[in-house]
């Protein structure tokens, strides 16, 4: 059981922005409105929170919405990745990237090569949502874990984009090119920053071939491509 003192301390952590996770070209290092009241499991819910302008690579799978903090019982834990539990759809999808819900990816699993597989990168965010907290991809805290706030896809429906005005489209049990809060992207004019699993960082143009971008998100599809 999480005690009251620890919940309060975790709230303080949630409220605290971290400069390393903020793109200075996009927004200031400050706390922004927390729009998911009641959603935190192990901490008291704050009014404001620190956010991240960077996201993990979940791979090239089609995004599937999920709403679970994790298995609540031993039985659920045993069935968590077999597809029988709707709330565990993300795990059952067996993502091809390196960081996702309950991921345990080691370097030996990245058979396409560490330098040819994305680790993380800048995330797309509409300019009108930089401070609002109303974007579905930027409404929670830096420390929330697996969520579109911290996780993005390289599926060809979701090419990297320069920040632009976009509608708020809620991903339910479908996915299409209008759901932009799974895209990587940035505020920069011609390219975004992507880090590979070997620690190298490169600029990737918004005009990158969608198939190349997609394959760089998959750690083990055998379709090895050279990052542009």
What positions do the PLM features span?
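Surface-exposed loop/linker segments characteristic of extracytoplasmic
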Residues: 1-228
């Amino acid at each position: 059981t999480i005690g009251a003192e620890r919940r309060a301390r975790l709230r303080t952590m949630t409220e605290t922005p971290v400069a390393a996770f903020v793109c200075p070209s996009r927004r200031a290092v400050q706390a922004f409105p927390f729009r998911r009241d009641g959603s935190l499991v192990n901490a008291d819910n704050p009014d404001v929170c620190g956010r991240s302008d960077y996201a993990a690579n979940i791979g090239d799978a089609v995004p599937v919405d999920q709403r679970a903090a994790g298995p609540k019982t031993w039985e659920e834990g045993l069935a968590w990745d077999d597809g029988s539990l709707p709330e565990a759809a993300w795990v059952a999808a067996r993502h091809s990237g390196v960081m996702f819900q309950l991921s345990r990816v080691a370097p030996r699993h990245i058979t396409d090569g560490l330098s040819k597989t994305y680790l993380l990168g800048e995330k797309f965010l509409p300019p009108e949502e930089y401070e609002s907290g109303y974007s579905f991809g930027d409404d929670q805290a830096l420390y929330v874990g697996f969520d579109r706030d911290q996780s993005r896809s390289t599926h060809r429906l979701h090419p990297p984009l320069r920040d632009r005005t976009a509608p708020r489209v809620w991903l339910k049990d479908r996915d299409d090119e209008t759901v932009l809060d799974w895209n990587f992207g940035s505020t920069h004019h011609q390219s975004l920053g992507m880090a590979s699993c070997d620690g190298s960082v490169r600029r990737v143009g918004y005009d990158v071939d969608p198939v190349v971008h997609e394959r760089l998100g998959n750690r083990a599809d055998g379709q090895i491509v050279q990052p542009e």
